[in-house]
Structure formats: structure tokens, C-alpha cells
UniProtKB/Swiss-Prot annotation:
Gene3D superfamilies documented for this protein: 3.30.230.10, 3.40.50.670, Histidine kinase-like ATPase, C-terminal domain
Function statement: A type II topoisomerase that negatively supercoils closed circular double-stranded (ds) DNA in an ATP-dependent manner to modulate DNA topology and maintain chromosomes in an underwound state. Negative supercoiling favors strand separation, and DNA replication, transcription, recombination and repair, all of which involve strand separation. Also able to catalyze the interconversion of other topological isomers of dsDNA rings, including catenanes and knotted rings. Type II topoisomerases break and join 2 DNA strands simultaneously in an ATP-dependent manner.
Gene designation: gyrB
Protein name: DNA gyrase subunit B
Family, similarity comment: Belongs to the type II topoisomerase GyrB family.
Any one GO cellular component localisation term in the record: cytoplasm
Matching NCBIfam families: PRK05644.1
Toprim domain residues: 431-545
Length: 638
């Protein structure tokens, strides 16, 4: 069957629907997770995912994402174009059916989409429901179609033909503006769009994705012929690798059970000399941050092949020695990407994959190709095994230290660590922990705080660089030990968010480069050992003022040079203007520290979130202070 015949076979009869759109505007969080920053950007990806599905089906090669000056988003692809014929049930065009009926889409019909990132017919209708303006253009069958919707998915008029195109010219173009009567009035962030688009390009080898910020006349183009091999290379940029090769495994597996479907597996692996891991997994281009069966299969393969190789080549010192899953992680950078016809996810956020055959497929395909690689490259194989055994020794030593520390711990709010001055409230939701640079500022913060809800933990020494030190060294650091004890959650695999004692963790450092560096070191530790604190939005960065500007009548604070000049221009007629530049938090008395940096009514904070894993990893590996300073340009009152 020719490609043109396949295109013509995809029509209205392939569009199935399960229920209406009524609930979306009333309960948007059920469909996009939130109405804030994350949910707003999720609207883009629901549209883009449709275009990616066209690419995975073999019909699209190019996707464009455009950010317009009025905060409109436009997504264009060169896929087949939405079906335009009349749907047999709705008696409306297939375009209108897709855009106005929840759970309507071609993704239910496996003859048209072998693989997709979930039920994306849901997504495009939800975007329409949450937009005050939504336009669609379709090129299909030699004609150019257009339809507009307003106020949450109400069509202005039926789909109409507005022109003609070449018969081989196909595709879909969508332009929407969020309905800010429902969504939080937050602007789209071009950096976030770029980061996510780049991930999609890595996962779809050869797919071209461009992102354009029309206001700033900025365009970024992504196309990776190496796919996830290029992804691993990017994540290891600037690091010394254990072996020069990126081990790549790919294949297709089908279980022998009735009605089994193909599972396509792509995995890329490389070790570096650090003590942390970056394992990122995806199912049908959806990042599975909580792992799942494909990650289990990945570790099954690594531990089995590593142990077999070590035993066969007598690399173990005794018969009781075994490499565990935890021992394989230090320095491991891996991308795991599977494509499944019928992915089963845990929960609406699709954070965890549950298909049993994904575990079998990943294990089998990685095992075969990893075993062959190690047999053909014995020096590289030995280096990997030695890295795992070094990790094992560190892990056992750390476990012993952790057990000794555990015996010292008392009740949940008792036996306070270090110089922690705790607050009186026992309600974690209102409790705030200020991690303060220096004893002097820590003393002022203790005197100026709200003792009911604000706890102070001064940093007495330099925080360790968790990116460059092994587990044992990090755990031996007194400042780290104090933070772990104070927060109460544990770390890494033992981390329990339900035991968190403070729902605001505020990093309060000097407003200079040194302060930014200390903040970065703290963020690096949280990211590597207590990552959910960042992912769930519990970590904030305080923004203390740089200047105090006073006259006989008024006192104002400036947080940067531009703000200082703005204040001075307003006071130009005043006499005896006093300008004090704060070199550090310790120069403020308790009242000033409260007024400028700790008072919930006036303080300025940055809520630090890792919007995408790749962006977060890169921000901790490269350009440390520069990256953090960029993050700290957008502040949010708490």
C-alpha cells in the first residue's frame, strides 16, 4: 500500500470518542495537573505530542513551535493533517469531533497509530477547552481548511475550505491562547519550551524540531541523527568518562502470550568518574520520572550481566561477593526509551510504567547486547566492574555510618542538630526552615524571626560539592548531616516525603557571587540526594536586598542596580540621601533582616523547580553560578 493510500485511509471512521468535554473547565487540574506554570506548559506538549505521534507513525519529519508576543502558542507539523470528513456519529467534521469531544482521537485505533504517548485525542480537546481562542488549519487532499473556536471550545462556524494546496502537501497547524479566567496569569517560558523540545528531538532520531520566540527574534533548531546516543553524550559533557564508548542497545521484542504486541527498546549507557547517576527513562516519549517496569528490566540486565562477567573472569575477591542494583549506579548515565502499543501508566501524570512485557523486553534486549559488548571489549568491561565494586565498598561503609547516625536520633522534633533554632509549631505545612550563610546572619535571623513558624539553621562551614564527592565523603560533612537530621526525610532510596518537617526550605545567602555559589552547592546536594524536595516545590531561594536607600522621611530597599537607580530617580528632589550597600546578610540587624528577607508579607523568593530533568542536570554540571543567577532573575512572593 502506498503512503498516499495510507493517508487517505485515515479518516473520520477512525475517530472514536468516549465522553464529552463538560468537566474540563470546571476541574482543569484533573486533566493537566495544575493551572499554574507546569499546567500551562503542559498545554503545549499535548499539541506537540500529537505531532510527535505523526512522526513515530512515519508521516511527519518536521515540527515547529512558535511563541507569539501576546502569549499565543503555535504548533505546526507536516504530518497527514487531521481528518476533515464528516464523522458518522457526531455528524460534524472529524476536526471538530477531535477538538470538542473528550477522548476523541485516532490513537484508540491501532491501525493508524502503532505507538503514541497515550490518548492524545484527550489532550487537544482539553487545550481547546482551556483556551479563549483556538485556531486550526489543515492541509489535506489538496485543500486548505480552517476553523476557529472561542471561550473554551465553542466553534465560531463549521470547518471551511479557505484555499487549495498541492495534493502531496499535508499537515496541521494549531494556534491557541490560554484562558486566563481559568489558568493562572503566567507567561510561557521560552527556555522551558526549548528544554522540552530538545528532549523530544533526542528521543526521535532524525526528527527536526524548531522553537521560535517571535518577540525576541530567536530560533533554536534541534535534530539529532544519533538520537539517545547524542543525549548521553550531552549529559556527560565536561565529565571524565570511564570508557570512551557509549554502549547502545536496540531491538524489538514480542511476548508469547495471546494478543501480545511489539515492544521497541532503545538504551544508551556510559559511565563517568563521578559518584552520582543520571538515569532517565521514557515510554512513548513520556518521561517516567518514577521509573517502572522498563527501569526494572534495565537493572535486571545490568546486575545479571555484570555478575556473570565478574564471576567468569574471576574479578570477585570471594565467592560471596555480588554486585547489586545500587552498586551499578555511581557514574552511570543512561537513557532508557521504549515504545509500546498499549502503555499502562500509574496515575494520570504517567510517571510510572506498569506493563509487564516492558520489563521482559528491556531485560532481554539489553542483556544480549551488553554481554556481547563486554566480551568484545574486556578492558572496558573490567573498568565498569571495578567502578561497581568501588561503589559497593562506599555503600557498605555509608550504611554503617548511617546506622550509627540513626541510633543517635531521637523523636521526630527532638535532639536538634547543630545550631538549629527550631520553631514552636508542630504543623509541617506552616513550618519554614531557613538555611542561613554564616553565624552572624544566623544570629540575626534567630532574633528577627517568627518563632512560631520559622526555624533557623546557620551554616558554619563550607557545604561540600555533592557533584564531585563520593557518598561517604558527602555523608561525613557536618553541614550535610545537620540538614538531613533537621529535615527528617532521609535520603536517596530511603527518602520519605511524608516525614518532611518543613514545607518551606529557604536558602538564605549573601546577595553576591559567593552567596550564589553556596546556594548552588546546596541545590546540588538537594538535587542529588533529596530530589523530591525540588520536584514537589519545597525549596526556595531568598533574595536579600543589595542596597538600603534612606532619606529623613523614607527608607527603601533595592534588590539590584536597576532598582536602585529607579528609587534614586524618584528621590532626586530629596536632600541627604543615604545609600548603604550590604556586603552580606550579617550587616543587617534582626529588624532589617525580618523586614527585607523573612517577612511573608514583603519578602521576595525564587521557588526552585526542575522543569525538565535535562535542564536541571545541566544546570548542576555546567556554568554553576551563571545558571543560578539566571534562575534567580524571576522571583515570586510566597
Amino acid at each position: 500500500m502506498s503512503k498516499q493510500e495510507e493517508i487517505s485511509k485515515y479518516g473520520a471512521k477512525n475517530i472514536q470518542f468516549l465522553e464529552g468535554l463538560e468537566a474540563v473547565r470546571k476541574r482543569p487540574g484533573m486533566y493537566i495537573g495544575s493551572i499554574g506554570f507546569r499546567g500551562l506548559h503542559h498545554l503545549i506538549w499535548e499539541i506537540v505530542d500529537n505531532s510527535v505521534d505523526e512522526a513515530m507513525a512515519g508521516f511527519a519529519t518536521n515540527i515547529e513551535v512558535k511563541l507569539h508576543p501576546n502569549n499565543e502558542i503555535e504548533v505546526i507539523d507536516n504530518g497527514r493533517g487531521m481528518p476533515v470528513d464528516i464523522h458518522p456519529t457526531t455528524k460534524k467534521s472529524a476536526v471538530e469531533t477531535i477538538l470538542t469531544v473528550l477522548y476523541a482521537g485516532g490513537k484508540f485505533d491501532s491501525t493508524n497509530y502503532k505507538v503514541s504517548g497515550g490518548l492524545h485525542g484527550v489532550g487537544v480537546s482539553v487545550v481547546n477547552a482551556l483556551s479563549d481562542s483556538f485556531e486550526v488549519w489543515v492541509k489535506r487532499g489538496g485543500k486548505f481548511y480552517y476553523q476557529k473556536y472561542i471561550n473554551g471550545g465553542h466553534p465560531v462556524k463549521p470547518l471551511e475550505v479557505i484555499g487549495e494546496v498541492n495534493k502531496d502537501e499535508t499537515g496541521t497547524r494549531i494556534k491557541f491562547h490560554p484562558d486566563y479566567q481559568i489558568m493562572d496569569k503566567v507567561a510561557f517560558d521560552f527556555g522551558t519550551i526549548i528544554d522540552h523540545a530538545k528532549q523530544i528531538a533526542y528521543l526521535n532520531k532524525g526528527l527536526s524540531i524548531s522553537c521560535e520566540d517571535i518577540t525576541k527574534n530567536t530560533i533554536r533548531n534541534f535534530c539529532f541523527e544519533g538520537g539517545i546516543i547524542d543525549y548521553v553524550s550531552e549529559l556527560n559533557r565536561g565529565k571524565k568518562v570511564i570508557i570512551p564508548d557509549i554502549i547502545y542497545a536496540e531491538g524489538t521484542f514480542r511476548d508469547k502470550t495471546p494478543n501480545a504486541q511489539d515492544v521497541i527498546v532503545n538504551v544508551a549507557i556510559q559511565y563517568n568518574e563521578t559518584y552520582t547517576s543520571n538515569i532517565v527513562s521514557y515510554a512513548n516519549n513520556i518521561q517516567t520520572g518514577e521509573g517502572g517496569t522498563h527501569e526494572q528490566g534495565f537493572y535486571d540486565a545490568l546486575t545479571r550481566i555484570y555478575n556473570k562477567y565478574a564471576e567468569d573472569n574471576k574479578l570477585f575477591k570471594n565467592n560471596n561477593e555480588k554486585i547489586s542494583r545500587e552498586d551499578t549506579k555511581d557514574g552511570l548515565v543512561a537513557i532508557i526509551s521504549i515504545k509500546h502499543t498499549d502503555p499502562i501508566f500509574e496515575g494520570q501524570t504517567k510517571g510510572k510504567l506498569e506493563n509487564k512485557d516492558a520489563r521482559i523486553a528491556t531485560n532481554k534486549i539489553i542483556s544480549e547486547q551488553l554481554e556481547r559488548y563486554m566480551a568484545e571489549n574486556p578492558s572496558h568491561a573490567k573498568a565498569i566492574i571495578e567502578k561497581c565494586l568501588l561503589t559497593q565498598r562506599s555503600r557498605l561503609a555509608a550504611n554503617a555510618a548511617r546506622e550509627a547516625s540513626r541510633k543517635k536520633e531521637g523523636s521526630e522534633f527532638g535532639n536538634l542538630p547543630g545550631k538549629l533554632a527550631d520553631c514552636s509549631s508542630k504543623n509541617a505545612e506552616v513550618r519554614e526552615l531557613f538555611i542561613v550563610e554564616g553565624n552572624s546572619a544566623g544570629g540575626s535571623a534567630k532574633m528577627g524571626r517568627d518563632r512560631a513558624t520559622q526555624a533557623i539553621l546557620p551554616l558554619r562551614g563550607k557545604i561540600i560539592n555533592a557533584e564531585k564527592q563520593d557518598f561517604t565523603s558527602v555523608m561525613s560533612n557536618k553541614e550535610v548531616s545537620s540538614m538531613i537530621h533537621a529535615l527528617g526525610t532521609g535520603i536517596t532510596d530511603e527518602f520519605n516525603i511524608n516525614k518532611l518537617k518543613y514545607h518551606k526550605i529557604v536558602i538564605m545567602t549573601d546577595a553576591d557571587v559567593d552567596g550564589a555559589h553556596i546556594a548552588t552547592l546546596l541545590l546540588t546536594f538537594f538535587y542529588r540526594y533529596m530530589r523530591p524536595l525540588i520536584e514537589y516545590g519545597f525549596v526556595y531561594i531568598a533574595q536579600p536586598p543589595l542596597y538600603k536607600i534612606s532619606t529623613a522621611k523614607v527608607t527603601e530597599y533595592a534588590y539590584n542596580d536597576a532598582q536602585k537607580e529607579e528609587i534614586l530617580s524618584k528621590l532626586e528632589d530629596s536632600k541627604n540621601i543615604s545609600i548603604q550597600r550590604y556586603k552580606g546578610l550579617g550587616e543587617m540587624d534582626p529588624e532589617q533582616l525580618w523586614e527585607t528577607t523573612m517577612n511573608p508579607a514583603t519578602r521576595k523568593y525564587c521557588k526552585f523547580k526542575s522543569m525538565t530533568l535535562l535542564a536541571a542536570i545541566q544546570s548542576f554540571q555546567h556554568w554553576w553560578v551563571k545558571k543560578l543567577n539566571l534562575v534567580m532573575t524571576s522571583f515570586k512572593k510566597c
